[in-house]
């Protein structure tokens, strides 16, 4: 189902002008936070305009909103007055932490166990916190600009360096067991009461980053590598059996830090709003090749006759972009949440364009055909058209050699800001 958007009514008037000004201010603030190259002194964003060409929207699915949209923001003062919170989750969390058996077990000094004890490895006891819903546990962070820096909405932390079917969104759509937050000690965990990598105290962040293979984009932290590994008793020399056990005990003691006494206390889960029957979410395939405009000025430093001798303003005008992606619009009470999906998540939820076209033609997809890949290729922003103005030109080229570098830097920052602030799990929230 296709939707015709009245682009002029949505982007004009006082509300449209106010929204354009907030977008301009947001992009300007982002440029003030990034590290500029040596040959650029400053970047100023002067204006933003939505243009006159509307996007082409095709509704793919209407479903329930993502659970991330129900997380309560601590800075939102109006939510406490106008909305009801799910009271059972937070009180149940505190009640479980304050129960005497759980508190005494976490606080007392437990004796070290023999790492080679067969009965210990075959134990079926599980963590007291296993009954908690895994989606209440915070996700691992990843380096970069977090999604919560936007002044236009309420953003979430970015995914923990995972992509493709390893992301929680794609894992839910593909049926992969990503959200199983707790591991049975009999199935490979090292001690009772310590969760797997998705738990809040499972592993130190520096160890988590070390476990990620950056050379493989589909890799994710291994659960086995986050817990102490012990060599089998048969591999130890007979004379060093005692030494091997002592070494295993020390290694186990290093990872069995008591969360009640260590410097990393258990973090409370985010408060969740109550789901209502009238909440809904729309997935749209958005295509845009319009004339959105963005005006910037970058000051170029000249190093002749001395370093940073003078600065020349370079005016850059973004005259249009080409976009192809999947948009998410969720309506929850008096809030509208808006974001885009990454290519991997879009493929997992609604499939690719090639799969849809071949499904309509009843033609099977062959993996031997490299030109018919079912994956979405490239980023969401396919093209950014830009014009620069500075000094005179010779044969259609700029006289200053750094103009091209400035253009590439500015466009890279625009693309990076869009992908980090507009792609799920980051999203914008509008109060209506």
Curated annotation (Swiss-Prot):
It is a peripheral membrane protein. One of its GO terms (biological process) is mitochondrial genome maintenance. Residues 1-432 form the SMP-LTD domain. Its main location: mitochondrion. The SMP-LTD domain is a barrel-like domain that can bind various types of glycerophospholipids in its interior and mediate their transfer between two adjacent bilayers. It comes from Aspergillus oryzae (strain ATCC 42149 / RIB 40) (Yellow koji mold). Residues 182-273, 354-377 are annotated as: Disordered. The keyword Nucleotidyltransferase does not apply. Component of the ERMES/MDM complex, which serves as a molecular tether to connect the endoplasmic reticulum (ER) and mitochondria. Components of this complex are involved in the control of mitochondrial shape and protein biogenesis, and function in nonvesicular lipid trafficking between the ER and mitochondria. Mdm12 is required for the interaction of the ER-resident membrane protein mmm1 and the outer mitochondrial membrane-resident beta-barrel protein mdm10. Signal peptide: none annotated. GO terms for cellular component: endoplasmic reticulum membrane; ERMES complex. Residues 214-234 have a biased composition (Low complexity). GO terms for molecular function: lipid binding. This is Mitochondrial distribution and morphology protein 12.
């Amino acid at each position: 189902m296709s939707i015709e958007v009245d682009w002029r009514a949505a982007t004009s008037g006082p509300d449209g002008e106010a929204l354009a000004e907030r977008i301009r201010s947001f992009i300007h603030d982002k440029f003030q936070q990034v590290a500029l190259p040596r040959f650029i002194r400053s970047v100023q964003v002067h204006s933003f305009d939505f243009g006159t060409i509307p996007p082409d929207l095709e509704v793919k699915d209407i479903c329930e909103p993502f659970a991330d949209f129900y997380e309560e923001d601590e800075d939102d003062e109006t939510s406490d007055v106008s909305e009801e919170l799910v009271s059972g989750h937070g009180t149940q969390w505190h009640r479980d932490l304050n129960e005497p058996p759980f508190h005494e077990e976490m606080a007392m000094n437990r004796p070290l166990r023999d790492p080679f004890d067969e009965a210990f490895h075959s134990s079926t006891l599980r963590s007291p916190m296993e009954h908690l819903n895994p989606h209440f546990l915070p996700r691992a962070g990843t380096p970069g600009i977090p999604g919560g820096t936007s002044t236009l909405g309420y953003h979430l932390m970015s995914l923990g360096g995972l992509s493709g079917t390893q992301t929680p969104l794609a894992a839910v759509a593909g049926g992969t067991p990503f959200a199983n937050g707790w591991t049975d000690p009999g199935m490979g965990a090292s001690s009772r009461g310590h969760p797997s990598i998705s738990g809040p105290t499972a592993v130190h962040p520096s160890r988590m980053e070390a476990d990620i293979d950056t050379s493989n984009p589909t890799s994710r932290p291994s659960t086995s590598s986050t817990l102490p590994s012990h060599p089998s008793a048969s591999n130890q020399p007979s004379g060093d059996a005692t030494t091997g056990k002592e070494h295993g005990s020390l290694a186990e003691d290093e990872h069995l830090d008591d969360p009640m006494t260590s410097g990393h206390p258990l973090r409370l889960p985010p408060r969740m709003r109550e789901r209502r029957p009238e909440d809904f979410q729309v997935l749209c395939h958005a295509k845009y090749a319009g004339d959105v405009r963005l005006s910037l000025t970058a000051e170029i430093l000249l190093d002749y006759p001395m370093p940073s001798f003078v600065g020349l303003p370079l005016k850059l005008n973004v005259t249009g972009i080409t976009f192809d992606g999947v948009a998410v619009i969720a309506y929850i009470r008096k809030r509208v949440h808006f974001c885009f999906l990454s290519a991997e998540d879009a493929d997992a939820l609604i499939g690719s364009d090639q799969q849809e076209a071949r499904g309509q033609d009843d033609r099977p997809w062959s993996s031997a055909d490299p030109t018919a890949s079912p994956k979405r290729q490239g980023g969401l922003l396919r093209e950014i058209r830009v014009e620069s103005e500075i000094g005179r030109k010779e044969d259609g080229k700029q006289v200053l050699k750094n103009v091209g570098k400035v253009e590439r830097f500015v466009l890279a920052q625009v693309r990076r800001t869009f992908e980090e602030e507009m792609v799920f799990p980051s999203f914008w929230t509008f109060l209506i």
